Amino acid sequence: MVYAVVRAGGRQEKVEVGTIVTMDRVKNQQSGKVVLPAVLLVDGDTITTDAAKLADVTVSAEILNDLRGPKIVIQKFKNKTGYKKRQGHRQDLTRVQVTEIN
């Protein structure tokens, strides 16, 4: 069993071949593929965490689609002044599927 922990959009995700990961929006989408940097690699009983060895490891993923996350509401309130502020936010996301771990 081969799996890797990759850095995807500011977070770390445990992935195998075929895993679908939702991460922050990927800007460069012309090719439809993205390479994720590996932080840890497990190949059977062998665990690799050395940065020099992980520089040779590539985790390739195919971009499936772009989407937007759920809306969150931010509210500010100050007592006794009548100050209220309400703001919403939806994060831009990209869904990718891991195609290979080399």
UniProtKB/Swiss-Prot annotation:
Q: Name one GO molecular function term.
A: rRNA binding
- A GO term (biological process) for this protein? translation
Q: Which UniProt keywords apply?
A: Ribonucleoprotein, Ribosomal protein, RNA-binding, rRNA-binding
CC annotations in GO: cytoplasm; ribonucleoprotein complex; ribosome
Please name the PROSITE patterns in this protein's record: RIBOSOMAL_L21 (PS01169)
Which ranges does the record mark as transmembrane?
none
- A Pfam family found in this protein is Ribosomal_L21p
Domain of life where this protein originates: Bacteria
User: What biological function has been recorded for the protein in this entry?
Assistant: This protein binds to 23S rRNA in the presence of protein L20.
Quaternary structure and partners: Part of the 50S ribosomal subunit. Contacts protein L20.
Q: So what family is this one in?
A: Belongs to the bacterial ribosomal protein bL21 family.
List the protein's name.
Large ribosomal subunit protein bL21
Q: What organism, scientifically named, is this protein from? A: Clavibacter michiganensis subsp. michiganensis (strain NCPPB 382)
Q: What is the lineage of its organism?
A: Bacteria, Bacillati, Actinomycetota, Actinomycetes, Micrococcales
Gene it is expressed from: rplU
